[in-house]
């Protein structure tokens, strides 16, 4: 009897342990060797601590065969990326060889999130999926009532005992899901589609959508903290830094809001072209792409423009700042590196097809997918 109880207890403990999401202190945030999610970390600031090569060279390209709008995640020497064929790929960073793939029933425009030993991604089939990072083994899927196009984000539960995944859907809801079990924790209803990823900081999540509102939600219970009129629908994702939120919208304006004051701090307007790109923010600057074919660098305190960099196509790709450089794609088919201080071109690579996806950046590496159906990796 004692032996039976001991064995049963071991089995129960093993089952419990396997259901946990194990996360170290450095995981879930961008590091020199990791870009685990869209924009690098929960506040969606789009900044990598790594350095870019002065003259990157193409190390490998991986053929998917269908257009890629999903932005890559890099973790543990693997690249994770989705494609319009509905497949999530895991690719060896050093060799460009496929490690595993898993298929969903819809296009994957959402960018993967790597947290602990799991990979999470949304699909246009309306499900949020969880897979084992090392093998691709399906763990669970959570159903929403419409397509998921934006990337998931993550937060610790208020008691610190579990992790939650937060994602928007075209069913008008923001969903909070337990990362270990796939069970819903709460959901928050908006007035229209949710396009982008929710930004997370200081116990709050901020996001916009087609209802032209910037929603501020308590992560503890999914209740409304505030909602702010943006003036037009928001195609992309906001970036947060403390109480400041930076976001562009469809009616050609880029905005800075103060959450504590629930007030608009400044508005930047140049040409009559919308902003689909999500911004990168540093301690001094905000950098965002526009459909006016330009990359804009703004003073984050005043909204005054510092410089503009022109490409030959719409810039829906979201820029990433890597120390004194910026990397961004354009629908002109080129990947660019631009100096942060002056906005001058330092390097470019012609892929030949539109780049809508945003680059993933770690030390000495850039990974990006393109509309030609290839994933490209650049290094020194």
Tell me the role of every PLM-derived stretch.
Residues 30-40, 65-89, 102-129, 142, ...:
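Repeat-blade elements of multi-bladed beta-propeller folds
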Residues 27-28, 38, 344, 380:
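Mature soluble domains of exported/periplasmic/lumenal proteins and thiol-rich metal-chelating peptides
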Residues 28-59:
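Blade/loop signatures of beta-propeller domains
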Residues 58-62, 97-102, 137-142, 183-188, ...:
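A short beta-strand motif characteristic of beta-propeller blades
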Residues 92-95, 132-135, 178-181, 218-222, ...:
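Short loop/turn segments that connect beta-strands within beta-propeller blades
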Residues 1-10:
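Bacterial N-terminal signal peptides that target proteins for export
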Residues 15-22:
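C-terminal segment of classical bacterial N-terminal signal peptides
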Residues 338-360:
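Short cationic/low-complexity microdomains
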């Amino acid at each position: 009897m004692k032996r039976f109880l001991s064995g049963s207890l071991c089995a129960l403990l093993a089952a419990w342990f396997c259901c946990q999401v194990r996360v170290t202190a450095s995981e879930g945030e961008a590091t020199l060797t990791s870009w685990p999610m869209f924009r690098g970390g929960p506040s969606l600031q789009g900044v990598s601590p790594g350095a870019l090569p002065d003259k990157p060279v193409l190390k490998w390209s991986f053929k998917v065969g269908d257009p890629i709008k999903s932005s890559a995640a890099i973790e543990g020497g693997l690249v994770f990326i989705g494609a319009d064929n509905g497949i999530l790929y895991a690719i060896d960073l050093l060799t460009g060889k496929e490690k595993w793939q898993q298929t969903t029933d819809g296009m994957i425009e959402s960018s993967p999130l790597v947290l602990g030993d799991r990979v999470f991604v949304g699909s246009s089939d309306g499900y949020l999926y969880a897979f084992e990072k090392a093998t691709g083994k399906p763990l669970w899927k959570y159903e929403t009532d419409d397509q998921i196009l934006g990337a998931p984000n993550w937060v610790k539960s208020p008691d610190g005992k579990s992790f939650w995944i937060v994602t928007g859907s075209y069913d008008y809801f923001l969903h909070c899901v337990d990362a270990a079990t796939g069970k819903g924790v709460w959901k928050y209803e908006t007035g229209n589609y949710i396009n982008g990823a929710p930004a997370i900081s200081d116990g709050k999540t901020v996001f916009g959508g087609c209802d032209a509102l910037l929603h501020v939600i308590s992560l503890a219970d999914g209740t409304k903290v505030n909602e702010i009129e943006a003036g037009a629908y928001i195609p992309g994702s906001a970036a947060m830094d403390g109480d400041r939120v930076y976001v562009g919208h469809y009616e050609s304006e880029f905005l800075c809001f103060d959450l504590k004051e629930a007030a608009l701090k400044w508005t930047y307007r140049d040409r009559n072209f919308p902003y689909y790109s999500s911004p990168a923010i540093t301690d001094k600057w905000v950098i965002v792409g526009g459909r006016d074919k330009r990359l804009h660098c703004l003073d984050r305190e005043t909204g005054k423009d510092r410089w503009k960099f022109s490409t030959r196509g719409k810039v829906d790709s979201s820029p990433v700042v890597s120390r004194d450089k910026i990397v961004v794609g354009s629908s002109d088919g080129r990947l660019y590196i631009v100096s942060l201080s002056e906005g001058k071109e330092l390097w470019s690579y012609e892929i030949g097809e539109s780049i809508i996806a945003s680059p993933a950046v770690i030390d000495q590496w850039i990974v990006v997918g393109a509309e030609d159906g290839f994933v490209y990796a650049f290094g020194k």
